[in-house]
Amino acid sequence: MNFSSFPTHELLAYDIELSYYEGNIKKCQRLQDLGLLTGDNAVIYTNRHDDDEVVLLPTFFRQGQTDNNKPLNILHGSCRKLRGKGEDCLAIADRLIAASVKNLNKRPSVLFLTSDQIYADDAAGPLIQHLTEFGTHLLGWEEEIVGLNKKLTEIGSGERQQFISEHAKFTSENGGNHLISFGEFAAMYLISWNIQNWPLLFQDIEFVAEKKVKRKYQIEIEQLKRSQRALPVVRRILANIPTYMMFDDHDITDDWNITREWNERVKESDYGKQIVANGLAAFWAFQTWGNDPSLYSDEFITGITQYLDKNGNPNIHTRKSFVDYLWNFYDWTFAAPTYPVTIFIDSRTQRKYDSLKGPPMLLNDEGLETISRTTYKVNYYNKGDPILIVSPTPVFGFELA
């Protein structure tokens, strides 16, 4: 069912049924069976003081274009780093939803996450081994990285900077634990939103002699534990509000396409091109596919799945096709079905460069045409209606970003 077909300004509850086979026997599980409706892992909001208010399933609502007197209450966030300082601000959204579960005039209508849902270029040292192993487990095979003469499991925590700078031609100065394989990118998304995907224990670092490195590692563990405690709340938020996401640079790598020189240098590196493609494929799977699934053709999906389904043995042609397809795909801009309509623009892959090292224009002519085309495809948009524009990269005061 298309999201726009749901009734507007009406509280909607839902359940999910997962079907699978054990041998020839088909089995099904729902949210209750998965332990997601009770206890610490519950993704529902309850009012313990008034039984009439209790809703025993996750809920959401859709604000519509005919609700002219109904507010569009937007929650907005960006730049969420698991080892960042302080508390996870995304948890604030949980309190806002909990305070207005059935009051749709006050309850947040949508959540906009407008860049850097992960920091691929600056993963935490205590997590990197787990991300590598978890990523391999997810795929069922260990991805071969062109130009890397060793396995990712053979690279220690904090030891990736040289590969990133010299071989991938990236400019991140914090790339000691830069994500590389598709599996690592996928694992990073899965631990960012679900506590059950975390390691039971963090890898010891007692073998490191340098006190400064040890201290940094221990600080990162404390920061990660703080983020970890907020994850049940984060999952509940995402289960109870329509959420739309767009990338900026850190979802792929710091300084992504910041200048023509950067773009051309990385294009000349098979290693760098493969990492960017892996990041884009993971962005599609974990962020933007849910924004508007109709944007992605069977050809696009096949281009990704053919590579990932090769069980660790993709041939050179399959890998090249995967990388080239993602590097030459530019239809990331999309419209969120709000009123006014919201256009999320891709301000990274359709830039215009007037010089080798100078700041770019955020959008080239094709990018501007994409915005126009995307807007007029919205069936309830009429010329002259207001539009919300979401740009992950700053529009005003923009220089090199």
Give the positions of each predicted feature.
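Metal-dependent phosphoester/phosphodiester hydrolase catalytic core
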Residues: M1-A401
